[in-house]
Amino acid sequence: MLTIHTYFDSPARSDGSQKWVDFASTYWHVDCVRKMSINAFIDHYENWCKRKKYNFSKSKAEEIYGKAKELVPVLPKDDITKLIIKQAVDQLNSASITVESLRTLMNETASKLPEYPVVMAMKGVGTSLGPQLMAEIGDVSRFTHKGAITAFAGVDPGVNESGSYEQKSVPTSKRGSSDLRKTLFQVMDVLIKTHPQDDPVYQFLDKKRAQKKPYYVYMTAGANKFLRIYYGRVKEYLASLPES
């Protein structure tokens, strides 16, 4: 029904379940929605959310219902169509369970690293992106200064004629670790979506966006600032630990 995944942005749960997939399993045909009255659908959707322990939004229900009323069904609402949808849902759930199991394993492995608590306390980082960052950056002591770690990621701003760093316009570099840059961009995306007002990286991103900087400029500049803070916090924390 519709491109239903675009209506839900909830992350997958630890058991692999996803709201949009569960929705598609219940409302497997557009007629499952549009044949109801709007009030009946809202009530049905609210009860479904309670039963599945998902957040309910009346405006979201109204949006979905309005879109469903505009659509013309391509496939008939019959047992064959229902079977096709069920098989697709089962495959999606199976893949999601595997992914979430791997994420759990990654997090358990990363939790044994000494820098784990300080990295996980950073805004924009969670049980998925945190372990990715630690794996891709490795031991921060191998970087002699903050500029070395940003160069490693390919988000260093470069040097101006006076020899000092210039951050007015920061393009994405083709050098460095593309995997780390991707993870850093994902962290920036989380910050933009969650907008933690007290976070210095988000404040910096918000300022650059307000200045109408191009997407890759403000994302790379934000990644640069995040990495510098990461480097400083992790080094300081590790230095404070008693020697083993």
Stretch-by-stretch model annotation:
Residues M1-S244:
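A detector of single, family-specific signature residues
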